[in-house]
Amino acid sequence: GLPVCGESCFGGTCNTPGCACDPWPVCTRD
């Protein structure tokens, strides 16, 4: 959910461990 991971995921995936592309295109932590 939150907070944001400081990463965008236009490609649909996040490189930051523990982060998910939700809501697209923003990476957030569970």
UniProtKB/Swiss-Prot annotation:
The membrane spanning regions, by residue number, are: none
Q: Which GO BP terms apply? A: defense response
InterPro entries xref list:
Cyclotide, Cyclotide_moebius_CS, Cyclotide_sf
Post-translational modification (record): This is a cyclic peptide.
The location annotated for the cross-link Cyclopeptide (Gly-Asp) is 1-30
Q: Sorted alphabetically, which keywords does the UniProt record give?
A: Disulfide bond, Knottin, Plant defense
Q: Which PROSITE patterns match?
A: CYCLOTIDE, CYCLOTIDE_MOEBIUS
Question: What intrachain disulfides are recorded?
Answer: 5-19, 9-21, 14-27
Give the source's domain of life in one word: Eukaryota
**Coiled-coil intervals:** none
What the protein does? Answer: Probably participates in a plant defense mechanism.
The family note in this entry says: Belongs to the cyclotide family. Moebius subfamily.
Q: Any notes on this protein's domains?
A: The presence of a 'disulfide through disulfide knot' structurally defines this protein as a knottin.
What this protein is called in its record is: Kalata-B14
Q: Which organism is it from?
A: Oldenlandia affinis
